[in-house]
Amino acid sequence: MKTPYLVSILLAAALAIIYLFQDQYADQMYLFSNAFPPVIAAVTVVSSIYGLMKYWGKLEDKFSKIWLGFTLGMIFWFLGELFWAIYTLLLNVEIPFPSIADVAWLIGYAPMMIAFHWYVRTFQFTISKKVYRAGAITIGLVSFGLFAYFLTPVLAEMAGKEVVAVGIDIAYPALDLALFGYALLALLIFTGGKIAVAWALISIATFMDVVGDMLFSLTTLQGTYYNGHPLELLFHFSYILYALAFYAHRKEF
């Protein structure tokens, strides 16, 4: 097994153990919960930068723009994690939501969405239009169903909540589902190809973000979220998978 994959598995296992036994070190867990995300997000940024360096030709090249989009998206998500850590660890704001961290995270979706869209559009010719359309319709219906399923309990918790907070709570899963849909289309296109592994990893990463943000939205609306909540593992694992996906892409294509 290649070293990056082994390290990722060991890291994921260590994270699961840390969260499982957090009652034994509750004070330290608060620090870890807020300090670790910028670190793992930074690792993902570095992995995307290596990809950008490999594929960069000139700004007019679509592949250069795609990897620039990946990198910019990860940078903004890293900034979101960093701002959250500053709020919690330096400014003593226990749960900074909504905050400037959300601005950075939401901005990050724009370059990521563009990169995913361009990637799919660039290579969709490799499968028949019939298969592509069938896949797009199926993925769209599944995504809509998941969003509708999530929206029901959110609407039930909306009473008395700030409009901005509720809007952000809805925006995250909606944007995650859009990325998830594009990732599945890319996986459909590249199944059996050299970069199928990369897009499989990205698909899993985006799905973890979908579930993680749905749970975060519900728990913040219900007032049950806390620093060190097990749902944070989904975001940690997602960053690990993105970093691995960028690595796999560089090695296979």
Model region roles, listed by residue range:
Residues 1-253:
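Polytopic alpha-helical membrane-helix bundles and their juxtamembrane interface segments
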